A protein has these predicted regions:
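Surface-exposed strand-loop-strand hairpins of Gram-negative outer-membrane beta-barrel proteins
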Residues: 48-73, 152-154
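Residues on the lipid-exposed face of transmembrane beta-strands in outer-membrane beta-barrel proteins
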Residues: 44-46, 76-82, 90, 115-119, ...
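Residues that define the transmembrane beta-barrel architecture of outer-membrane proteins
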Residues: 38, 70-74, 108-113, 131, ...
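Outer-membrane beta-barrel strand-turn architecture
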Residues: 36, 82-86, 121-127, 170-174, ...
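Outer-membrane pore/translocation modules
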Residues: 103-207, 252
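Outer-membrane beta-barrel biogenesis signature
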Residues: 23-55, 123-130, 305-314
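Transmembrane beta-strands of outer-membrane beta-barrel pores
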Residues: 46-52, 92-98, 121, 139-145, ...
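Outer membrane beta-barrel transmembrane domains
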Residues: 55-57, 62-64, 201-314
Length: 314
């Protein structure tokens, strides 16, 4: 008989590394900032996410067999200005999962390598107003063959992902609004078993993974020293099925989520090239997701690969 399970925080935490965790960077794929030519931003970040309630389908409930499910992450991240219109970004996290109750052991290990190309397709300045259009593309792939089918404690789902994003940014007197939308296409994955049940019995080790639509809006204040912003995310899978009552989750479940949060960055004038970042997010609505709180901190250094320290961002 299967034990009651909750849905894995991995998908909220780890796939949102495509967005949420990289929001700690001095520049990332969901903001209107570009690194200048030959500027390289590199650093480390740490994050923790946890929940003790989850949505089983649309029902918000608890699971005493797991208690609080926690995910900790330490990651290396960076971005490089190829020129003033093209930036390359990367991230690779180390994940550790755990549950405060029950007998299930968590996992730890390197998860996925993600690389983005961010292109400034159009920018128009008129007085104090600046309007920008961006096109972003990315790929992610597992860096090891980790266990996928042990939710909610797997460190990843093991799919290879392609991300296509369009983004608009408007700024006036250092106040800004940025809106973006992404399509995330996911490859099939293979399990360590030859049969599984979704809404019917499937005699195969291969699982079709639904694609995802991800939307992001952020608004706030930014200048050369400070960024302070409110962020809202919406994540909707294009298919999948609900967790059945008191049953184990499955990698291709439907996973929908809305979360809100705040994000900040500080670049001290006296510490040229240094960026300190922090963020907090709360999941406010979901389906087959943990009702998670998420906090993260980062330290980054901007250098000029031509040999100069610090530099200018667009």
């Amino acid at each position: 008989m299967k034990k009651p399970f909750t849905y894995n925080i991995y998908f909220l935490f780890c796939l949102l590394l495509l967005t949420g965790a990289r929001q700690l960077m001095a520049q990332n794929e969901t903001d209107g900032i570009m690194m200048g030519k030959n500027l390289y931003c590199v650093g480390v970040m740490t994050a923790r996410s946890g929940w003790d309630q989850y949505w089983e389908g649309g029902l918000l409930r608890r699971n005493e067999n797991l208690g609080t499910v926690s995910t900790k992450m330490t990651g290396a991240m960076g971005s490089l200005g190829i020129n003033k219109k093209l930036n390359i970004l990367f991230s690779m996290p180390y994940i550790r999962t755990s549950a405060s109750a029950g007998q299930l052991s968590g996992f730890r290990g390197m998860q996925d390598l993600t690389v983005f190309a961010k292109y400034l397709a159009y920018r128009k300045k008129s007085g104090k107003n600046t309007f920008s259009v961006f096109a972003i593309g990315g790929l992610s792939t597992p860096v090891q063959n980790y266990v996928k089918d042990y939710l909610p404690l797997s460190i990843g789902l093991g799919s290879r992902n392609m991300i296509l994003r369009g983004m608009l940014d408007y700024e006036r007197n250092h106040l800004f609004t940025t809106i973006s939308s992404s399509l995330i296409t996911r490859s099939n994955i293979e399990l360590d078993r030859k049969a599984y049940y979704t809404t019917q019995m499937v005699y195969s080790d291969r699982v079709d993974m639904p694609n995802v639509i991800y939307n992001n809006i952020r608004a706030g204040f930014r200048n050369k020293e400070i960024v302070a912003e409110f962020v809202a995310d919406n994540w909707v899978t294009q298919g999948g099925f609900d967790i059945t009552r008191n049953n184990m989750p499955f990698p291709s479940n439907r996973m929908n989520m809305t979360r809100v949060g705040i994000n900040g960055k500080y670049e001290p004038v006296k510490w040229k090239g240094i960026s300190l970042t922090a963020a907090f997010f709360q999941t406010v609505n979901g389906r087959n997701m943990g009702r998670a709180s998420h906090a993260q901190f980062g330290f980054f250094y901007i250098l000029n690969v031509s040999g100069k320290t610090g530099g200018k961002k667009n």
